[in-house]
């Protein structure tokens, strides 16, 4: 599913134990793209040694309920490993979808990456 295409996710370590995964897609509405993004996120998570991850969605303008379901599956994948996830940078349509789905009841949804890192950072 990844043959010949660049990854939709880049990773950087932030304040030690928190890894920030940045999504490089502005329109997460096509089934193929959602599937590829899910694969790329799992690969980045499995390759990392962090116990907390921030998903930076600041570049995402549109997403579907299928994409929302994929993010929830990523959250469950991390929880099974004893890891935590926060979403950051959602604005406009994406923020509305998260609010309507009451996603903040399941995991932290923060306006900025910095706030998400602060929430997940070990004391």
Placement of each model-derived feature along the sequence:
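Intrinsically disordered or compositionally simple regulatory linkers and C-terminal tails
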Residues: 1-5, 123
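Short secondary-structure boundary/capping segments
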Residues: 2, 10-12, 77, 99
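STAS-typified acidic loop motif
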Residues: 4-39
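Amphipathic alpha-helical interaction surfaces in cytosolic regulatory modules
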Residues: 27-107
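Short acidic-hydrophobic, aromatic-tinged amphipathic segments that line or gate anion-handling sites
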Residues: 108-116
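Generic C-terminal helix-cap and adjacent flexible tail
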Residues: 115-123
